[in-house]
């Protein structure tokens, strides 16, 4: 498959490596031509993913028209910059041909839109899937066993996305609840801030356990109120992502 990764950060790069390892034709798009040229020449993402050699097959382009030649478009841009990237993509976007896989997490500042709402607002109705779960980019790039979930209202699309990424070290489950999966990836960050405060104050394990337990309960209730399935928050994109964010030194 021909896939373009829109974003040259750590997560986009790590997922590009997974896709290349699976035999796909992958191009990374980024906004800074000089940095893309450096990555292409040195085969390392020195800003965001140090110490990991990039595969020779991975291609780079600063030209959105070239990136849009792929049928699969993976949005791996930080949420607050994603709208600008979508605006660049819009002139080339063909909803009958393209499918969008989003891996960014969060809520848009100011509008409070979820990422799927932002994408449909800019690009219009499209084939959309979100990929989320407990997955540090550094570990994925080093082929540490990882499990995530692909979610779409079109379960067959979610299965297609799962097949794109699935290999011996990267397991992808499927879900028909993109709202719940997206909200899990966003809401856990609020709980993670509180977990960091507990660590900083050296309060011990008891309050953190209470925080995580009550935090996932609140995430489930809010997620249900916003249209998600409460059961989704007991999965990889809910409690899984919450645990890895609140307990890891990476965060």
Indicate residue ranges for each PLM-predicted region.
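Rossmann-like NAD(P)(H) cofactor-binding subdomain of soluble oxidoreductases
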Residues: 54, 60-145, 161
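Alpha-helix C-terminal capping/helix-to-coil transition sites in glycosyltransferase folds
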Residues: 68-69, 187, 239
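C-terminal substrate-binding/catalytic lobe of Rossmann-fold NAD(P)-dependent oxidoreductases
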Residues: 227-251
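Internal alpha-helical scaffold of NAD(P)-dependent oxidoreductase catalytic cores
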Residues: 81, 92, 118, 122-127, ...
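NAD(P)+-binding Rossmann beta1-loop-alpha1 motif at the extreme N-terminus of oxidoreductases
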Residues: 1-52, 61-62, 88
């Amino acid at each position: 498959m021909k896939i373009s990764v829109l974003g040259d950060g750590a997560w986009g790069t790590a997922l590009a490596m997974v896709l290349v390892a699976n035999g796909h034709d992958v191009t990374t798009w980024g906004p800074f031509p000089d940095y893309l040229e450096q990555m292409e020449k040195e085969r390392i993402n020195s800003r965001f993913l140090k110490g990991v050699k990039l595969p020779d097959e991975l291609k780079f382009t600063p030209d959105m028209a070239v990136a849009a030649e792929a049928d699969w478009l993976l949005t791996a841009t930080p949420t607050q910059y994603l709208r600008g990237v979508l605006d660049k993509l819009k002139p080339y976007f063909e909803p009958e041909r393209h499918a969008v896989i989003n891996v960014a997490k969060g809520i848009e500042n100011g509008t409070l839109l979820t990422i799927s709402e932002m994408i449909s607002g800019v690009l219009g109705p499209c084939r959309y899937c979100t990929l989320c779960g407990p997955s540090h980019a550094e570990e994925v790039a080093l082929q540490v066993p990882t499990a995530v979930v692909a979610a779409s209202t079109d379960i067959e699309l979610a299965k297609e996305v799962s097949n794109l990424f699935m290999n011996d070290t990267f397991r992808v489950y499927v879900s028909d609840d993109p709202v719940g999966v997206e909200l899990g990836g966003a809401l856990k960050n609020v709980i993670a801030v509180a977990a960091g405060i507990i660590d900083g104050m050296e309060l011990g394990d008891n309050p953190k356990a209470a925080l995580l337990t009550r935090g996932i309960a609140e995430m489930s209730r809010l997620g249900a109120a916003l249209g998600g399935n409460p059961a989704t928050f007991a999965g990889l994109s809910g409690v899984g992502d919450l645990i890895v964010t609140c307990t890891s030194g990476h965060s």
